């Protein structure tokens, strides 16, 4: 049972030739043939169990790593921690209370559980969506507006934003505990069962509510994320082009001057951060200081710019791929259920006819997968998170200090190197103190 997937029904629970019931806010067919019913139930249990276990294990692991590993406590990871909590909440308060009543054809948990679970599920979906938006805006500020965003890119500000998203979500979803109730119905064997139903007083209110949810939980967040990640991708591509041109220019200058290319050993020290790992930049070695002291200011900056080009190029391409996956999977997981909700609110009969049975089960399952793919996208695909996982659990193979050396993260004490990814901001890069 999922609040966002509440396929609301105002009419009767029976529509020939197949009796349609809204059990636990899910459409199902009451008179399916026995072999087909058993086969579908087996597949449903298998898929639900797999997604449930993956979500619980993945999000629990994310929460554990982010809490126990001090170097993982960045601004971005604070949002990821909130996202993991909301995804875990969605899994725990959604999937069992959808699957079990679907199999039993009866909501057996009582009215209090019906109201509580609908409320928690609606809140978890809302928090997840708002966290995704907050992460996209935070990444936009860190990558596209690094100097301006430093004013508000702090852990305390992130905690305030997270607290606001949770409070706002709990407030928005207050209609669910108010209007969620158990509705009795008679099954084919003349036994009385219950459905957990979210019913507003009128069709107009239902349509308005579904339109409201469609806007604030899908359309508006989707547009914001597409725009934010689109601008980030554009900025990264500009940075890649700038890196390539700077590398070529620096190489030509070294060849023409007959100099030896120093600074190559420090390439990894200037690798751009993705915000998921916190690593102090090591002080320059004595040889590097001597090389820098014998060069002009412009030469130092050129070497710094060019030395990290290869590493930056790889890191930026990896970030772009991850951002594309984030946006695509967000729409893939949530577009079907939001579309079904709107269809259900405006054309109940047609929605019942086309969505009952397997289609709605697949749509619901697709929306549930969002709770398990987020840890994979944001953390498990990230090298720094894997290093944090290994540091948190000593039983895992330790990659050694070389695994984290030179991977500079986002520091908020002003001692790290801050550089924009675009050609317009490279001149602001400092190796001593943050720009003001």
From Swiss-Prot:
Location of region: Disordered: 252-280
GO MF annotation terms: cholecystokinin receptor activity; peptide hormone binding
Subcellular location as annotated: Cell membrane
Cytoplasmic side: 68-77, 138-157, 235-321, 382-436
Alphabetical list of Gene3D superfamilies matching this protein: Cholecystokinin A receptor, N-terminal domain, Rhodopsin 7-helix transmembrane proteins
Extracellular side: 1-41, 105-115, 179-210, 343-357
Gene that this sequence comes from: Cckar
Keyword Glycoprotein: yes
Membrane topology qualifier: Multi-pass membrane protein
Disulfide-bonded cysteines: 18-29, 114-196
Native organism: Mus musculus
Record-annotated membrane-spanning stretches: 42-67, 78-104, 116-137, 158-178, 211-234, 322-342, 358-381
SMART domains: 7TM_GPCR_Srsx
Keywords: Cell membrane, Disulfide bond, G-protein coupled receptor, Glycoprotein, Lipoprotein, Membrane, Palmitate, Receptor, Transducer, Transmembrane, Transmembrane helix
Protein name: Cholecystokinin receptor type A
Lipid attachment, kind S-palmitoyl cysteine: 395
Lineage: Eukaryota, Metazoa, Chordata, Craniata, Vertebrata
Function: Receptor for cholecystokinin. Mediates pancreatic growth and enzyme secretion, smooth muscle contraction of the gall bladder and stomach. Has a 1000-fold higher affinity for CCK rather than for gastrin. It modulates feeding and dopamine-induced behavior in the central and peripheral nervous system. This receptor mediates its action by association with G proteins that activate a phosphatidylinositol-calcium second messenger system.
